[in-house]
Every structure is written in C-alpha cells, then in structure tokens.
UniProtKB/Swiss-Prot annotation:
This is DNA primase large subunit PriL. GO terms for biological process: DNA replication, synthesis of primer. It comes from Sulfurisphaera tokodaii (strain DSM 16993 / JCM 10545 / NBRC 100140 / 7). It holds the Pfam family DNA_primase_lrg. HAMAP family: DNA_primase_lrg_arc. GO terms for molecular function: 4 iron, 4 sulfur cluster binding; DNA-directed RNA polymerase activity; metal ion binding. The gene is priL.
Length: 306
C-alpha cells in the first residue's frame, strides 16, 4: 500500500488528523493566533486567484495542509460565489496537472481513498484508421454501474464520456489515464465545493475576523458614481450588471433591470461570459473617477489582501 502525499493533496487529510501533530487539544485558531504565517499564505493565494495568476502546488508550500484549510475557510467566510468558483477552478487545474504526472499505482490509491473503486488492468485494443492498424493502451477500468455513477455529470458536458465511446467487457468499462484523471478531478472538485459551502462548519475566529475586515471594504468609487446616476447608457449599465454578478449580488441586478433573465445572460455560458472591465479599460471609457491603485474595481471591493 502506497503512502499518500498529503503535502501535494492536502484536502485528502482531515484537519483534525493534521492538528494531532501538535500539542494535544490545539486548534487551528490557536495556531493562527500564535503567528501570521498561515493567514499570510491564505491571503496571498486568494490574491493570486482574484488576479488570475498561477498558483503554486501545495507541496511547494511549508505546512501545506494547514495552509490549505486556512485558505479554504477564508474563502468560505468571504462567502462570495464568484470567488468560490475561481478558487475551485484554480485548485482543480493544479490537481489535474499533478495527477497526470502520478504513477498508475498512485492514481488507483488516490481513487480508492476517495471511494472510487478503480482497477488497474492494462489491455491493448487494436483498431483500424485510414487503412492502418493502430493500438490503444487502456490501463484502467471501472465497474459498469460505477462508470455511470461517476460520469453522470461529465456525460452532460462531454460526449467523450458516453458509454458508446468506450470498451465494455465483462461488466467493466475501460478508460485511459487522461479519462481517469478527469473523473478524479471532477470528484475532487465536488468534494472541495461541499467543503467550501458547508454552512455548519465552525470557522476559526481569526479567519472570521479577517473575512469581516476584507468584506468591509467600500464599493469602488467608479461603481458608486454609476449607482448615483439616474440614467445609464448601455456601457454603464453593462458595467454595473457585471459588477453585481461578480460580487454575487444578483438581487441588485434584478432590481436594476426588472428582468430576471438578465442574470443568466450575463453569467454567460461555455462560449460567452461577461466580466468586469479592468481599471485601465474603465479609464479609456471615461468611467474612472479616482486613483485607487488597483488593477480592477473588484480588487478594491475585496481588498488587496495586504
């Protein structure tokens, strides 16, 4: 049995188990009170998420399990849908990259740890393409029922996961490494989403205080100016709607437009998504009214996390 690398995949290790490494009875809040390292790391990570910068893999960070939970709880405490989505997207990207570099045995171990009964039993499939005989190595398999269960949502968004696209033999569906990783990432993302959305979790006081401080930031001056105007042109209206949606205030969008469908339109789909202009673009449009030293109005709203 392999030993899982919790430094690289900290979400696999319960916080309580990590805290046992310290003095008996110590809590995460006790550690946060004793020093600023974990909060500083969490703020830096969230700042990078908001600025769409590349994140480090957790195994490059000291005490990665505690940094992960501090970041997770801070995102939960800030309670913003846009931030949660960006957090999940960014973390999922790193996880996928790491999993693709893992050995077959490690992937199976991680899958089993998550409750996915994935088997490693390599088979070679011969097929013809353009009159040439080619071979495909399928190293993993899932029980037919488990395949349908774990790919239920994936099949809605990606035809590659339809049963018709796979080899079914002796009650098993055979898969490539890339497909297994995709399934794992989807399951892990769902696990993280549940963790960040749990309402009854006790968020450490130090994290709650920081979140309250960050949420207390004022509305950007440019947005305040637009809210004061009695009449808005199409560009100004679009900016205000995008701002409300990005901060998770859909009610204000409906109040402003009297149209419940506008939220769905501006949230976009796979091909189209509306985002708030950068401060540079706001200046070009003549909508900037103050020097805030930020790159985007949302940075003013969430704070610079400094």
């Amino acid at each position: 049995m392999l030993i899982l690398d919790f430094r690289k995949y900290p979400f696999l290790k319960p916080l309580e188990d990590e805290l046992k490494k310290y003095a008996g009875g110590i809590s995460l809040n006790d550690l946060l009170v004793s020093g600023s390292y974990y909060l500083d790391q969490a703020k830096e990570r969230i700042d990078k998420i908001l600025k769409d910068k590349e994140l480090e893999s957790y195994d490059k960070i000291k005490d990665s399990v505690l940094v992960f939970y501090t970041t997770l709880y801070l995102v939960a405490a800030l309670d913003n849908d846009m931030l949660k989505k960006k957090f999940l997207d960014k973390e999922s990207q790193i996880i996928e990259k790491n999993l693709l570099n893992e050995s077959e045995e490690t992937l199976v171990e991680i899958a089993n740890y998550l409750g996915l009964n994935i088997n490693y039993n390599n088979i070679e499939i011969k097929y013809k393409k353009n009159k040439k005989t080619l071979s495909l190595s399928l190293k993993y398999s899932l029980n037919f029922i488990d395949f349908l269960k774990y790919t239920r949502e994936l099949r809605k968004i990606d035809n590659k996961f339809s049963l018709a696209s796979h080899i079914l033999k002796d009650g098993k569906v055979y898969l490539t490494k890339e497909e297994i990783v995709r399934i794992l990432v989807f399951q892990i993302r769902d696990k993280l989403m549940k963790m960040v959305n749990v309402s009854d979790v006790v968020i450490p006081e130090q994290i709650r205080k920081l979140a309250d401080e960050l949420k207390g930031r004022k509305t950007p001056p440019c947005i305040l100016e637009l809210k004061r105007k009695k009449e808005l042109n199409n560009t100004e209206l679009g900016v205000l709607i995008a701002y409300y949606i990005d901060i998770g205030d859909e009610k204000s969008v409906i109040d402003l437009t009297k149209d419940e469908n506008i939220v769905k339109k501006f949230k976009g789909d796979k091909k189209t998504k509306y985002i708030l202009y950068s401060c540079k673009k706001m200046k070009e449009l003549g909508l900037c009214v103050a020097s805030c030293n930020t790159l985007n109005p949302l940075q003013f709203y969430y704070g610079k996390l400094e």
